[in-house]
Amino acid sequence: MLTPAVFPAVLYLLALVVWVEMFCLVAVAVVEREIAWALLLRMLVVGLMVEVGAAAAWTFVRCLAYQRSFPVLTAFP
């Protein structure tokens, strides 16, 4: 079952997959330079978004673990 503590791990695994795919795209781009660079740029943006999401999720989980020792932005104060 997915609990809030598992979300950062899942996001980090997704980020790892993205970076591995980017490495493969670089290898393809060396041989075929047409579409691989556009795909590489797209994967770079997706990878960075996943990394930022994982960092935000991990910060939120740490905050819950420390019983809100620092404030969390919420929609309804």
Curated annotation (Swiss-Prot):
Localization: Host membrane
Highest taxon of the lineage: Viruses
UniProt keywords, alphabetically: Host membrane, Membrane, Transmembrane, Transmembrane helix
Key word Membrane present: yes
Membrane topology term: Multi-pass membrane protein
Transmembrane feature ranges: 10-30, 35-55
GO cellular component, as recorded: host cell membrane; membrane
Protein name: Protein UL148C
